[in-house]
């Protein structure tokens, strides 16, 4: 799993962000993958939708939000891995069974679901 260490909270997470005007959810996911990691998604699969208390997040500036997360899995991509320097400290591949401890709290449930899915396959 390719993760990014963010510059704002210094925690690991996946590429993501807000939907811009006129974009679909999938277009936004593809754009964020390219902007933050330099990769172009060839195929994406809707994996998980997450909302509620477990998506509560407090930004380093004190802003509090509840996110709605629509998670895609991208297994086929092309391009050269390149981090977005303003938002990303580091990009690194991890084995899904060896995810770092310092991942952002709101994405922990997503990884739990991903691990469950892999065990069913």
Per-segment meaning from a language model:
Residues 1-14, 41:
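N-terminal strand-loop-strand
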Residues 7-9, 25, 87:
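Residue-level structural signal for beta-strand termini and adjacent loop
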Residues 10, 35, 79:
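Glycine-centered loop/turn positions within well-structured domains
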Residues 12-16, 92-95:
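A short, polar/proline- and glycine-enriched secondary-structure boundary/capping micro-motif
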Residues 14-48, 72:
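The catalytic Nudix box helix
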Residues 50-80:
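Active-site-adjacent beta-strand/loop module that shapes the phosphate/pyrophosphate-binding cleft
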Residues 71-73, 82-113:
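NUDIX/MutT-family hydrolases
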Residues 116-121:
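Acidic/histidine-enriched, glycine/proline-rich intrinsically disordered or flexible terminal extensions
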């Amino acid at each position: 799993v390719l993760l990014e260490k963010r510059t704002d909270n210094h925690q690991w997470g996946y590429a993501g962000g807000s939907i811009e005007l006129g974009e679909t959810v999938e277009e936004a996911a593809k754009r964020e993958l390219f902007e933050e990691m330099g990769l172009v998604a060839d195929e994406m699969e809707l994996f998980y939708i997450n909302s509620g208390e477990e998506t509560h997040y407090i930004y380093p500036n004190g802003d509090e939000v509840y996110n709605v997360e629509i998670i895609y899995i991208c297994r086929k991509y092309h391009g050269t891995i390149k981090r977005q320097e303003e938002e990303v400290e580091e990009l690194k591949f991890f084995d899904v069974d060896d995810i770092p401890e310092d991942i952002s709290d709101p994405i922990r449930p997503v990884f739990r679901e991903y691990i469950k899915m892999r065990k069913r396959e």
